[in-house]
């Protein structure tokens, strides 16, 4: 491998000749051999850095035109666009497990953008600190990258995934409107319910989750950029905070604004905790929905067997013909991961000592993993399971008419205690509710038929 010599305030460093990073990135790459190649700083953060660095250069060009010249701005913007598009991903090797402020990832962005800008200019025009990091600090750029990436992850990936599954459930509601089945509480038989009503519960849960996510994402539109080192805005020109937020809004098409209190935005991560709570709520509902689906599909002969789900792959290496609810299992595992991530995000957010939180990379890593995994799991569950759900009408009818909880319909006619006696006798003697009720003398056979209609109990 060929190397070139780069230097920083600590001296010279050998850097691979084909890489755009420089001394500070290389030092971090050498000093933090923790999860290398596996737990790399999320690409969403890298791309957010491209957005904020471009926005900062645009703002500096207006506020400091003598320093951020048109020549510099032109090549910096092009380099940032390559970062945003992912073209330069290979030049961002740093892991999550580094300094808790994300300083080295900020410098990774500064160095790559500067060196790429210099390549585009055909000369040494831009400096990582003096130009790319102008009017900024790692302490305000990393929180800004966290918020930009979190907003994009929720609004552009997770919410569309939820809406996709909602649309599938709406279709299934319409298709199964007339089917009545046994309801269940505590995993025990309960009074009847329409299958469409059961599906509507799933759909409504996801609609509420989407509503909560839209509420929770709003505070994430506030950006720390302009607070610089400790929130005072040292070395940033007057008006930079407001202008750079406008530029981020322009680049993303999302309503980003400057945070009203930079001392808060550097040290507190409460907005991230709040938003991740909404992600966790979605995960909880997906856990419930997926569990319902796999219970209802259990069998095919010895389980509930009330619905059919797509058969996507063989389920066992030893039992021929076995097909498992694999999409349900995948989404429930993702839900567990999200719940664990919620603990990590909360713990990390609590570590805002004095003027800066120094657990930001791990908070960002877990937050973005949750949003990404849950979105992809929901899409997979929708496309490979939910769209193919069909009702086993015969099994639903059989289970419904064998349910002892239909006795609830008799309460107005024979009273709660007599209805309970009827159910217990039917269960003990292995007879129908009608036979038990008549034998106990509570109703005649004719009166039972007159008042007992399971399909009307919904």
Language-model features: locations:
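Conserved, well-structured ligand/cofactor-binding cores
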Residues: 1-458
């Amino acid at each position: 491998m060929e190397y070139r010599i780069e230097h920083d305030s600590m001296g010279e460093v050998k850097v691979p000749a084909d890489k755009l990073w420089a001394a500070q990135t290389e030092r971090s790459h050498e000093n933090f051999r923790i999860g290398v190649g596996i737990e790399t700083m999320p690409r969403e953060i890298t791309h957010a850095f491209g957005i904020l660095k471009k926005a900062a250069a645009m703002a500096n060009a207006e506020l400091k035109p003598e320093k951020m010249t048109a020549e510099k701005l032109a090549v910096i913007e092009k380099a940032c666009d390559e970062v945003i598009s992912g073209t330069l991903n290979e030049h961002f090797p740093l892991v999550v497990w580094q300094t808790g402020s994300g300083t080295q990832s900020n410098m990774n962005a500064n160095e790559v953008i500067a060196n790429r800008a210099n390549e585009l200019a055909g000369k040494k025009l831009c400096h990582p600190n003096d130009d790319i990091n102008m009017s900024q600090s790692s302490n305000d750029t990393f929180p800004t990258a966290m918020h930009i990436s979190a907003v994009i992850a929720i609004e552009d990936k997770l919410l569309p995934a939820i809406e996709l599954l909602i649309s599938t459930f709406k279709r299934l509601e319409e298709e199964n409107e007339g089917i009545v089945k046994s309801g269940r509480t505590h995993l025990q038989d309960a009074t009847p319910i329409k299958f469409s009503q059961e599906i509507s519960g799933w759909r409504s849960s996801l609609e509420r989750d989407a509503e909560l996510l839209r509420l929770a994402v709003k505070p994430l539109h506030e950006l720390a950029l302009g607070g610089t080192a400790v929130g005072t805005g040292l070395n940033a020109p007057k008006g930079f905070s407001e202008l750079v937020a406008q530029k981020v809004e322009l680049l993303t098409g999302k309503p980003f604004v400057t945070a009203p209190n930079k001392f808060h935005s550097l040290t507190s991560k409460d907005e991230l905790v709040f938003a991740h709570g909404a992600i966790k709520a979605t995960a909880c509902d997906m856990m419930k929905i997926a569990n319902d689906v796999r219970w209802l599909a259990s069998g095919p002969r010895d389980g509930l067997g009330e619905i059919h789900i797509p058969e996507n792959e063989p389920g066992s290496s030893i039992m021929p013909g076995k097909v498992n609810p694999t999409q349900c299992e995948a989404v429930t595992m993702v839900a567990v991961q999200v719940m664990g991530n919620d603990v990590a995000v909360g713990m990390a957010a609590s570590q805002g000592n004095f003027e800066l939180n120094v657990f930001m990379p791990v908070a960002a890593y877990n937050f973005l993993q949750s949003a990404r995994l849950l979105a992809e799991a929901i899409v997979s569950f929708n496309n490979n399971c939910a769209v193919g759900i069909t009702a086993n009408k015969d099994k639903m009818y059989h289970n419904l008419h064998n349910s002892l909880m239909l006795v609830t319909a008799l309460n107005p006619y024979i009273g709660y205690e007599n209805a309970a006696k009827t159910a217990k006798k039917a269960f003990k003697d292995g007879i129908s509710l009608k036979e038990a009720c008549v034998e106990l003398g509570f109703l005649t056979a004719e009166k039972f038929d007159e008042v007992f209609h399971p399909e009307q109990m919904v």
